[in-house]
Protein backbone atom coordinates (compact mmCIF):
# COMPACT_ATOMS: atom_id res chain seq x y z
CA UNK A 1 0.00 0.00 0.00
CA UNK A 2 1.36 3.42 -0.98
CA UNK A 3 -0.18 6.31 0.98
CA UNK A 4 -0.06 9.97 -0.07
CA UNK A 5 -0.56 12.48 2.75
CA UNK A 6 -1.45 16.11 2.02
CA UNK A 7 -1.00 18.55 4.93
CA UNK A 8 0.29 22.13 5.28
CA UNK A 9 1.39 24.17 8.28
CA UNK A 10 3.07 27.39 9.31
CA UNK A 11 2.72 30.52 11.42
CA UNK A 12 -0.63 31.66 10.00
CA UNK A 13 -2.14 28.21 9.42
CA UNK A 14 -0.83 26.69 12.63
CA UNK A 15 0.86 23.31 12.86
CA UNK A 16 -2.09 21.15 13.91
CA UNK A 17 -2.60 19.54 10.49
CA UNK A 18 0.99 18.44 9.98
CA UNK A 19 1.41 17.34 13.60
CA UNK A 20 -1.68 15.14 13.31
CA UNK A 21 -0.56 13.57 10.03
CA UNK A 22 2.99 13.00 11.25
CA UNK A 23 1.59 11.10 14.23
CA UNK A 24 -0.60 9.01 11.96
CA UNK A 25 2.32 8.32 9.64
CA UNK A 26 4.31 7.03 12.62
CA UNK A 27 1.53 4.51 13.20
CA UNK A 28 1.39 3.49 9.53
CA UNK A 29 5.06 3.43 8.52
CA UNK A 30 5.67 -0.26 9.25
CA UNK A 31 2.86 -1.42 6.97
CA UNK A 32 3.05 0.86 3.91
CA UNK A 33 5.04 3.34 1.81
CA UNK A 34 4.33 6.98 2.64
CA UNK A 35 4.82 10.17 0.64
CA UNK A 36 4.06 13.56 2.22
CA UNK A 37 3.00 16.54 0.10
CA UNK A 38 3.34 19.79 2.02
CA UNK A 39 4.34 23.46 1.87
CA UNK A 40 7.79 24.96 2.37
CA UNK A 41 7.10 25.94 5.99
CA UNK A 42 6.45 22.34 7.05
CA UNK A 43 9.16 20.48 5.15
CA UNK A 44 11.74 20.47 7.94
CA UNK A 45 9.20 19.42 10.58
CA UNK A 46 8.02 16.45 8.51
CA UNK A 47 11.48 15.28 7.44
CA UNK A 48 12.01 11.64 8.46
CA UNK A 49 13.93 8.66 7.10
CA UNK A 50 10.82 6.47 6.95
CA UNK A 51 9.01 8.51 4.27
CA UNK A 52 9.50 10.95 1.42
CA UNK A 53 8.57 14.62 1.77
CA UNK A 54 7.74 16.62 -1.37
CA UNK A 55 7.10 20.38 -1.35
CA UNK A 56 4.17 21.22 -3.62
CA UNK A 57 4.71 23.95 -6.23
CA UNK A 58 2.98 27.28 -5.67
CA UNK A 59 1.41 27.20 -9.14
CA UNK A 60 -0.72 24.49 -10.80
CA UNK A 61 -0.90 22.42 -7.64
CA UNK A 62 -3.91 20.39 -8.74
CA UNK A 63 -2.22 19.30 -11.95
CA UNK A 64 0.93 18.41 -10.01
CA UNK A 65 -1.00 16.34 -7.46
CA UNK A 66 -2.86 14.42 -10.18
CA UNK A 67 0.42 13.61 -11.93
CA UNK A 68 1.93 12.40 -8.67
CA UNK A 69 -1.04 10.16 -7.87
CA UNK A 70 -0.85 8.57 -11.31
CA UNK A 71 2.94 8.24 -11.58
CA UNK A 72 3.42 6.86 -8.08
CA UNK A 73 0.22 4.79 -8.29
CA UNK A 74 -0.91 5.98 -4.87
CA UNK A 75 -3.52 3.71 -3.30
CA UNK A 76 -4.77 5.85 -0.43
CA UNK A 77 -4.88 9.66 -0.19
CA UNK A 78 -5.16 11.46 3.14
CA UNK A 79 -6.09 15.15 3.00
CA UNK A 80 -5.66 17.18 6.19
CA UNK A 81 -5.92 20.74 4.89
CA UNK A 82 -8.29 23.64 5.47
CA UNK A 83 -11.02 23.00 2.91
CA UNK A 84 -10.11 20.10 0.64
CA UNK A 85 -10.81 21.33 -2.93
CA UNK A 86 -13.89 19.56 -4.32
CA UNK A 87 -12.79 20.18 -7.91
CA UNK A 88 -9.51 18.33 -7.36
CA UNK A 89 -11.19 15.48 -5.47
CA UNK A 90 -13.68 15.03 -8.32
CA UNK A 91 -10.83 14.73 -10.84
CA UNK A 92 -9.04 12.21 -8.63
CA UNK A 93 -12.19 10.11 -8.40
CA UNK A 94 -12.75 10.30 -12.16
CA UNK A 95 -9.18 9.67 -13.31
CA UNK A 96 -7.70 7.31 -10.68
CA UNK A 97 -8.59 4.35 -8.46
CA UNK A 98 -7.16 5.92 -5.30
CA UNK A 99 -9.26 5.97 -2.14
CA UNK A 100 -9.74 9.40 -0.54
CA UNK A 101 -9.92 10.12 3.19
CA UNK A 102 -10.53 13.65 4.50
CA UNK A 103 -9.65 14.86 8.00
CA UNK A 104 -11.59 17.58 9.83
CA UNK A 105 -13.78 18.37 6.83
CA UNK A 106 -17.36 19.72 6.87
CA UNK A 107 -17.77 20.87 3.26
CA UNK A 108 -20.48 18.67 1.73
CA UNK A 109 -19.15 19.18 -1.82
CA UNK A 110 -15.76 17.81 -0.83
CA UNK A 111 -17.20 15.01 1.29
CA UNK A 112 -19.23 13.61 -1.62
CA UNK A 113 -16.01 12.76 -3.50
CA UNK A 114 -14.36 11.01 -0.54
CA UNK A 115 -14.57 7.44 0.71
CA UNK A 116 -14.28 8.33 4.39
CA UNK A 117 -14.11 11.39 6.63
CA UNK A 118 -12.41 11.41 10.03
CA UNK A 119 -13.70 14.32 12.13
CA UNK A 120 -12.13 13.80 15.53
CA UNK A 121 -12.37 17.49 16.40
CA UNK A 122 -15.26 18.72 14.27
CA UNK A 123 -17.53 15.92 15.46
CA UNK A 124 -19.76 16.02 18.52
CA UNK A 125 -18.41 15.24 21.98
CA UNK A 126 -20.17 11.88 21.72
CA UNK A 127 -18.57 9.79 18.99
CA UNK A 128 -20.61 8.25 16.17
CA UNK A 129 -20.34 6.68 12.71
CA UNK A 130 -22.81 7.33 9.89
CA UNK A 131 -23.09 7.23 6.10
CA UNK A 132 -23.60 10.34 3.96
CA UNK A 133 -24.16 9.38 0.33
CA UNK A 134 -21.34 6.95 -0.43
CA UNK A 135 -19.09 8.30 2.30
CA UNK A 136 -18.62 6.84 5.77
CA UNK A 137 -18.10 9.54 8.39
CA UNK A 138 -16.41 8.99 11.75
CA UNK A 139 -16.98 11.76 14.28
CA UNK A 140 -15.92 12.56 17.81
CA UNK A 141 -12.98 12.09 20.20
CA UNK A 142 -12.87 8.33 19.58
CA UNK A 143 -11.20 9.20 16.26
CA UNK A 144 -8.87 11.90 17.53
CA UNK A 145 -5.24 11.22 16.62
CA UNK A 146 -3.02 11.57 19.68
CA UNK A 147 0.47 10.17 20.19
CA UNK A 148 0.34 6.72 21.88
CA UNK A 149 2.34 8.22 24.77
CA UNK A 150 -0.79 10.04 25.93
CA UNK A 151 -2.58 6.80 26.64
CA UNK A 152 0.36 5.69 28.81
CA UNK A 153 0.53 9.08 30.55
CA UNK A 154 -3.19 8.89 31.24
CA UNK A 155 -2.69 5.63 33.12
CA UNK A 156 0.18 7.07 35.18
CA UNK A 157 -1.28 10.49 36.00
CA UNK A 158 -2.29 11.36 39.55
CA UNK A 159 -3.89 14.70 40.39
CA UNK A 160 -2.15 16.33 43.36
CA UNK A 161 -3.88 18.52 45.94
CA UNK A 162 -1.07 21.07 45.80
CA UNK A 163 -0.85 22.88 42.46
CA UNK A 164 2.86 23.50 41.88
CA UNK A 165 3.49 22.86 38.18
CA UNK A 166 1.57 24.72 35.47
CA UNK A 167 2.03 23.99 31.77
CA UNK A 168 1.26 26.63 29.14
CA UNK A 169 0.76 25.35 25.56
CA UNK A 170 -0.92 27.82 23.21
CA UNK A 171 -0.41 26.11 19.87
CA UNK A 172 2.51 25.45 17.56
CA UNK A 173 2.67 29.02 16.24
CA UNK A 174 0.61 31.10 18.74
CA UNK A 175 -0.52 33.57 16.03
CA UNK A 176 -2.36 35.80 18.53
CA UNK A 177 0.70 36.01 20.80
CA UNK A 178 -1.34 34.83 23.76
CA UNK A 179 1.77 33.72 25.62
CA UNK A 180 2.54 37.37 26.42
CA UNK A 181 -0.97 37.84 27.77
CA UNK A 182 -0.49 34.83 30.06
CA UNK A 183 2.93 36.08 31.19
CA UNK A 184 1.49 39.48 32.09
CA UNK A 185 -1.41 37.91 33.98
CA UNK A 186 0.90 35.52 35.84
CA UNK A 187 2.75 38.51 37.32
CA UNK A 188 -0.51 39.44 39.09
CA UNK A 189 -1.40 35.97 40.40
CA UNK A 190 -0.92 35.60 44.18
CA UNK A 191 1.88 33.21 45.21
CA UNK A 192 3.06 32.81 41.60
CA UNK A 193 6.65 32.75 42.88
CA UNK A 194 5.85 29.39 44.46
CA UNK A 195 4.74 27.91 41.11
CA UNK A 196 6.80 26.33 38.36
CA UNK A 197 5.56 27.37 34.93
CA UNK A 198 6.53 25.52 31.74
CA UNK A 199 5.95 27.44 28.50
CA UNK A 200 5.91 25.03 25.54
CA UNK A 201 6.50 26.74 22.20
CA UNK A 202 6.23 25.13 18.78
CA UNK A 203 8.69 25.24 15.91
CA UNK A 204 6.48 27.69 13.98
CA UNK A 205 6.43 30.30 16.75
CA UNK A 206 8.47 33.45 16.04
CA UNK A 207 8.22 34.61 19.67
CA UNK A 208 10.79 32.33 21.30
CA UNK A 209 13.57 34.88 21.78
CA UNK A 210 11.16 37.50 23.14
CA UNK A 211 9.75 35.01 25.64
CA UNK A 212 13.24 33.93 26.67
CA UNK A 213 14.15 37.54 27.47
CA UNK A 214 10.88 38.01 29.36
CA UNK A 215 11.46 35.09 31.72
CA UNK A 216 15.26 35.14 32.10
CA UNK A 217 15.10 36.61 35.63
CA UNK A 218 12.37 34.22 36.77
CA UNK A 219 14.00 30.91 37.71
CA UNK A 220 10.62 29.27 38.33
CA UNK A 221 9.70 29.79 34.65
CA UNK A 222 11.01 27.50 31.94
CA UNK A 223 10.64 27.76 28.16
CA UNK A 224 10.60 24.55 26.15
CA UNK A 225 11.28 24.84 22.42
CA UNK A 226 9.54 22.21 20.30
CA UNK A 227 9.18 18.99 22.29
CA UNK A 228 8.76 15.41 21.13
CA UNK A 229 7.43 14.46 24.56
CA UNK A 230 4.38 16.61 25.24
CA UNK A 231 2.79 13.68 27.08
CA UNK A 232 5.73 13.55 29.48
CA UNK A 233 5.53 17.30 30.11
CA UNK A 234 1.78 17.26 30.64
CA UNK A 235 2.08 14.35 33.05
CA UNK A 236 4.13 16.65 35.32
CA UNK A 237 1.47 19.38 35.31
CA UNK A 238 -1.03 20.03 38.08
CA UNK A 239 -2.91 22.47 35.80
CA UNK A 240 -2.58 23.71 32.23
CA UNK A 241 -3.37 26.79 30.16
CA UNK A 242 -4.00 25.70 26.58
CA UNK A 243 -5.44 26.85 23.27
CA UNK A 244 -8.60 25.16 21.98
CA UNK A 245 -6.81 22.86 19.53
CA UNK A 246 -4.99 19.58 19.99
CA UNK A 247 -3.39 20.60 23.32
CA UNK A 248 -6.85 20.79 24.87
CA UNK A 249 -7.60 17.19 23.88
CA UNK A 250 -4.18 16.07 25.10
CA UNK A 251 -4.73 17.64 28.52
CA UNK A 252 -8.22 16.19 28.86
CA UNK A 253 -7.02 12.74 27.80
CA UNK A 254 -4.42 12.67 30.58
CA UNK A 255 -6.69 14.34 33.10
CA UNK A 256 -4.86 17.65 33.55
CA UNK A 257 -7.30 20.40 34.67
CA UNK A 258 -7.13 23.15 32.09
CA UNK A 259 -8.01 26.74 31.31
CA UNK A 260 -8.70 27.39 27.60
CA UNK A 261 -7.75 30.49 25.60
CA UNK A 262 -8.80 29.84 22.01
CA UNK A 263 -6.66 31.17 19.17
CA UNK A 264 -9.35 31.12 16.45
CA UNK A 265 -13.13 31.06 16.23
CA UNK A 266 -13.60 27.36 15.48
CA UNK A 267 -11.65 26.44 18.62
CA UNK A 268 -14.20 28.26 20.77
CA UNK A 269 -16.89 25.73 19.84
CA UNK A 270 -14.67 22.85 20.97
CA UNK A 271 -13.74 24.58 24.22
CA UNK A 272 -17.36 25.45 25.00
CA UNK A 273 -18.45 21.87 24.38
CA UNK A 274 -15.90 20.55 26.86
CA UNK A 275 -16.75 23.31 29.36
CA UNK A 276 -20.44 22.38 29.15
CA UNK A 277 -19.44 18.84 30.17
CA UNK A 278 -17.50 20.16 33.17
CA UNK A 279 -14.20 19.17 31.54
CA UNK A 280 -12.48 22.57 31.15
CA UNK A 281 -12.68 26.27 32.01
CA UNK A 282 -13.42 28.12 28.77
CA UNK A 283 -12.56 31.81 28.47
CA UNK A 284 -13.41 32.15 24.77
CA UNK A 285 -11.18 33.86 22.21
CA UNK A 286 -7.96 34.60 24.04
CA UNK A 287 -7.32 37.99 22.45
CA UNK A 288 -10.71 39.23 23.74
CA UNK A 289 -10.35 38.04 27.34
CA UNK A 290 -9.99 40.99 29.76
CA UNK A 291 -6.77 40.92 31.77
CA UNK A 292 -8.68 40.92 35.07
CA UNK A 293 -10.68 37.86 33.98
CA UNK A 294 -7.56 35.94 33.03
CA UNK A 295 -5.83 36.82 36.32
CA UNK A 296 -8.89 35.74 38.30
CA UNK A 297 -9.35 32.43 36.46
CA UNK A 298 -5.64 31.57 36.63
CA UNK A 299 -5.68 32.25 40.37
CA UNK A 300 -8.82 30.18 40.74
CA UNK A 301 -7.59 27.05 38.96
CA UNK A 302 -4.25 27.18 40.77
CA UNK A 303 -5.73 27.66 44.25
CA UNK A 304 -8.81 25.41 44.22
CA UNK A 305 -8.23 21.66 44.46
CA UNK A 306 -12.02 20.91 44.38
CA UNK A 307 -12.23 22.79 41.06
CA UNK A 308 -9.25 20.94 39.59
CA UNK A 309 -10.62 17.61 40.79
CA UNK A 310 -14.00 18.35 39.20
CA UNK A 311 -12.37 19.20 35.85
CA UNK A 312 -10.16 16.11 36.08
CA UNK A 313 -13.15 13.82 36.64
CA UNK A 314 -15.31 15.60 34.06
CA UNK A 315 -12.82 15.31 31.22
CA UNK A 316 -11.18 11.90 31.42
CA UNK A 317 -14.19 9.85 30.22
CA UNK A 318 -14.44 11.97 27.05
CA UNK A 319 -11.02 11.29 25.43
CA UNK A 320 -9.45 7.85 25.85
CA UNK A 321 -6.35 8.37 23.68
CA UNK A 322 -6.98 5.32 21.47
CA UNK A 323 -8.02 7.24 18.34
CA UNK A 324 -4.84 6.49 16.40
CA UNK A 325 -5.49 2.75 16.78
CA UNK A 326 -9.05 3.15 15.48
CA UNK A 327 -8.06 5.39 12.55
CA UNK A 328 -5.23 3.08 11.47
CA UNK A 329 -7.68 0.17 11.42
CA UNK A 330 -10.19 2.22 9.38
CA UNK A 331 -7.54 3.03 6.76
CA UNK A 332 -6.38 -0.57 6.53
CA UNK A 333 -9.98 -1.81 6.11
CA UNK A 334 -10.66 0.80 3.43
CA UNK A 335 -7.61 -0.27 1.44
CA UNK A 336 -8.41 -3.97 1.76
CA UNK A 337 -11.92 -3.47 0.35
CA UNK A 338 -10.34 -3.23 -3.11
CA UNK A 339 -7.99 -6.20 -2.77
Curated annotation (Swiss-Prot):
Pfam families: Glyco_tran_28_C. GO terms for molecular function: glycosyltransferase activity; hexosyltransferase activity. The chain crosses the membrane at residues 241-261. GO terms for cellular component: plasma membrane. Disulfide bonds: none annotated. Its main location: membrane. Keywords: Cell membrane, Membrane, Transmembrane, Transmembrane helix. It is found in: Cell membrane. Pathway: Spore coat biogenesis; spore coat polysaccharide biosynthesis. To M.jannaschii MJ1062. This is Spore coat polysaccharide biosynthesis protein SpsG.
Amino acid sequence: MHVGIFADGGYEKGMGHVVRMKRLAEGLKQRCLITFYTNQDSEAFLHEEHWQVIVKPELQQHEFILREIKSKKLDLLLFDILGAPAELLKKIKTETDAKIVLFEEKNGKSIQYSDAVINGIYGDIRSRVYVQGNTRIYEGPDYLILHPAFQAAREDYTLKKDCRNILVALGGSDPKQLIFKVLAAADQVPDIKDKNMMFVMGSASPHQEAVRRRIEKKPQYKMIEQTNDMAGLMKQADAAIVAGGISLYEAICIGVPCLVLSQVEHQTATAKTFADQGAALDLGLGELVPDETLIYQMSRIMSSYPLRLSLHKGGRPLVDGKGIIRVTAILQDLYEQEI
